[in-house]
Amino acid sequence: MAPSSSPEPVVDESHESSDSEVEQTELQSRAPKRRRLSESSTDSYVAPAPLPTLSRIKKKGADEENKPATSDKDEPVLIKDALEIGLNDAQNSFASLNVAPWLIGSLTTMAVRKPTAIQKACIPEILNGRDCIGGSRTGSGKTIAFSVPMLQKWAEDPFGIFGLVLTPTRELALQIYEQIKAISAPQSMKPLLITGGTDMRPQAVALAQRPHVVIATPGRLADHINTSGSDTIRGLKRVRMVVLDEADRLLAPGHGSMLPDVETCLSALPPSSERQTLLFTATLTPEVRALKSMPRPSTKPPIFVTEISTENNASIPPTLKQTYLKVPMTHREAFLHVLLSTEANASKPAIIFCNHTKTADLLERMLRRLSHRVTSLHSLLPQSERNANLARFRASAARLLVATDVASRGLDIPSVELVVNFDVPRNPDDYVHRVGRTARAGRKGESVTLVGQRDVSLVLAIEERVGRQMEEWSEEGVSVEGRVVRTGVLKEVGEAKREAAGEIEEGRDVLGRKRNKLKKVR
């Protein structure tokens, strides 16, 4: 967490110039207070089953927090220093990036007053008409980096369809849509959201009316291009600016690739020589980097490429504490229940990631029976439920969100303090995106990965990828294994799991209501 600052006026009295005042800002660094738990605990350590140990030397000791010394006497701020401070502050503003005043005012109402590093690097270049590849870690403000110059250019020549934003998931598309809608509030700008899970006919009608900016997932937009007729998609031929957000996912080859749908979408747009193309990602993959060396018209300037603390070279935020918890394969759910119920974690908003939709569905139902405030997000839920569940979690109506990797990219939920990997991700890059849901924008966060007998090699691969070792999870006065064995948790969790499985088999929703046409999770 960044040191808090509290402005205090300081009067500079001198013989040469009396009655002159300047304000000085004193940065006071306070060591964060830790919640003190009981000094003694009745928990005892009893291992239910022999567990493997990671084949490496564990790090010893905990990170020490040093409180910086503060001066007893404030030094006065000289006039020349005050002018320099003011000059530096002016340089660290959206105005210095040539952002239009109406956009600055709109950002201010959203409490966005100073640009981040990726915004300072990209906004001027995009306003100058350059194609851009922007790499920056999650939570660094990439959406504003492309939406602000897009809206500013649209305001200079407002027509539809001016801009197209492609993004891999429905939830991320909805988030971008809401953010663009908020930023453009002072203008009569019409954005349109095109995603799967909803009726195509209203979307086709809205698309034919030529909205100013379209935010879409590639699959659904490709469906419109292939089936909705030329009148519907004619406006796409006028697009001036296209954005590929989470470009590494959109351009990734292999099974389940979105690349064919992306190519279909781009084929309906003007040629690259007649439009501006922006790619943003948290991971600059070889597929993304290769675009820099592609042939370009001599009339177009070189592609602007910036890589600022991407998840290639600085994958894990320094404010994120990475831990692992060894669990027996047969009691993974019981360990999760105890972990979420400890004194330190009982009130933390958390996301629990699973590898499969079936696991996520079962976990949500089980945790609900164990009195947790929980909701879920996975690909087989109807879109209306996905939106409603995400809204419940954002509004803190649910403390826990059980999700698959559909929630691992781009979603900005600042309140998340804990990420739990119920299943260890098979791909280390997926781990990076998962834990990136917490410790965003300088906040503190923690990730806990449940490690079974077969997961040790996956954990070691993750550690090699991120360049840091996980610490073994611990909490003062708490033995998770002891609580699982001694407090009857195994029986309680086992019953809840059986009831949840029976509910799924009967075709009931998470509230126990019978559904005749409930889509069975596979």
From Swiss-Prot:
The keyword Mitochondrion does not apply. GO terms for molecular function: ATP binding; ATP hydrolysis activity; RNA binding; RNA helicase activity. A motif (Q motif) lies at residues 92-120. Residues 123-302 form the Helicase ATP-binding domain. InterPro entries: DEAD/DEAH_box_helicase_dom (IPR011545), DEAD_box_RNA_helicase (IPR050079), Helicase_ATP-bd (IPR014001), Helicase_C-like (IPR001650), P-loop_NTPase (IPR027417), RNA-helicase_DEAD-box_CS (IPR000629), RNA_helicase_DEAD_Q_motif (IPR014014). One of its GO terms (biological process) is rRNA processing. Coiled coil: none annotated. Its main location: nucleus. GO terms for cellular component: cytosol; nucleolus. Its EC number is 3.6.4.13. Keywords: ATP-binding, Helicase, Hydrolase, Nucleotide-binding, Nucleus, Ribosome biogenesis, RNA-binding, rRNA processing. ATP binds at residues 136-143. It catalyses: ATP + H2O = ADP + phosphate + H(+). A motif (DEAD box) lies at residues 245-248. Residues 319-481 form the Helicase C-terminal domain. Residues 1-75 are annotated as: Disordered. Residues 60-75 have a biased composition (Basic and acidic residues). It is found in: Nucleus, Nucleolus. The Q motif is unique to and characteristic of the DEAD box family of RNA helicases and controls ATP binding and hydrolysis. PANTHER family: ATP-DEPENDENT RNA HELICASE, ATP-DEPENDENT RNA HELICASE RHLE-RELATED. Belongs to the DEAD box helicase family. DDX49/DBP8 subfamily. ATP-binding RNA helicase involved in 40S ribosomal subunit biogenesis and is required for the normal formation of 18S rRNAs through pre-rRNA processing at A0, A1 and A2 sites. Required for vegetative growth. This is ATP-dependent RNA helicase dbp8. The gene is dbp8.
